[in-house]
Amino acid sequence: MAIQPLRLDPITVLGKQLVIELFDCVDTRFDDIQWIEESMLEAARQANATIITSAFHKFSPIGISGVVVIAESHLAIHTWPEYGYAAVDVFTCGDVLDGAQAVRVLSERLGSQRHLISSMDRGLGGHRLGLLSRSLAGNAPVDGDSPTLRWALGQGTGVA
């Protein structure tokens, strides 16, 4: 079987990456590695992801980094408890996983009061054209009616 060359086509989207910045996280367990890992696993479960494995590390004196590897790609987190801040990536491939639900679960569990969500379609050729990334901030927790999240997923008008 001959290997087919990749066509660099800007409309060939292989996945969506949500880059989420959660600010003013008020949950007191924000530096508890077991609770952060369980929160990430719960976000993956509620998003209908197929969990493969997870790995988390607790820094000294504070802070946690971790990743949940899923069949559909990954969820990653880095926390700065001293700032009440978490950086989260939700990268999804295919149309089974609900990345928005993962974002909602993490925002709620961490007690985030403000957020910034960037959305990027990942795929073949699009980066060369610079057409794929956009961001929007919100001054409220991410919930089921979050206009920021709807916008990041291409379902809203861009009003936070």
Curated annotation (Swiss-Prot):
Cofactor binding summary note: Binds 1 pyruvoyl group covalently per subunit.
An example Gene Ontology molecular-function term: adenosylmethionine decarboxylase activity
Cellular-component GO terms for this entry: cytosol
Record has S-adenosyl-L-methionine as a keyword: yes
Any single biological process term in GO: spermidine biosynthetic process
Cofactor(s) the protein requires to work: pyruvate
The UniProt record lists the keyword S-adenosyl-L-methionine: yes
Coiled coil: none
Superkingdom classification of source: Bacteria
Site residues by UniProt (Cleavage (non-hydrolytic)): E72, S73
Pathways involved: Amine and polyamine biosynthesis; S-adenosylmethioninamine biosynthesis; S-adenosylmethioninamine from S-adenosyl-L-methionine: step 1/1
Pfam families, sorted: AdoMet_dc
InterPro entries (alphabetical): AdoMetDC_fam_prok, S-AdoMet_deCO2ase_core, S-AdoMet_deCOase_pro-enz
E.C. number: 4.1.1.50
Keywords for this protein: Autocatalytic cleavage, Decarboxylase, Lyase, Polyamine biosynthesis, Pyruvate, S-adenosyl-L-methionine, Schiff base, Spermidine biosynthesis, Zymogen
Residues forming the catalytic site: S73 (schiff-base intermediate with substrate), H78 (proton acceptor), C93 (proton donor)
Post-translational modification: Is synthesized initially as an inactive proenzyme. Formation of the active enzyme involves a self-maturation process in which the active site pyruvoyl group is generated from an internal serine residue via an autocatalytic post-translational modification. Two non-identical subunits are generated from the proenzyme in this reaction, and the pyruvate is formed at the N-terminus of the alpha chain, which is derived from the carboxyl end of the proenzyme.
Chain positions found as Pyruvic acid (Ser): S73
Described purpose of this protein according to its UniProt entry: Catalyzes the decarboxylation of S-adenosylmethionine to S-adenosylmethioninamine (dcAdoMet), the propylamine donor required for the synthesis of the polyamines spermine and spermidine from the diamine putrescine.
Subunit structure: Heterotetramer of two alpha and two beta chains arranged as a dimer of alpha/beta heterodimers.
Protein family: Belongs to the prokaryotic AdoMetDC family. Type 1 subfamily.
PANTHER family: S-ADENOSYLMETHIONINE DECARBOXYLASE PROENZYME
Name recorded for this polypeptide: S-adenosylmethionine decarboxylase proenzyme
Organism encoding this protein: Pseudomonas paraeruginosa (strain DSM 24068 / PA7)
Phylogenetic classification of the source organism: Bacteria, Pseudomonadati, Pseudomonadota, Gammaproteobacteria, Pseudomonadales
Gene assigned in the entry: speH
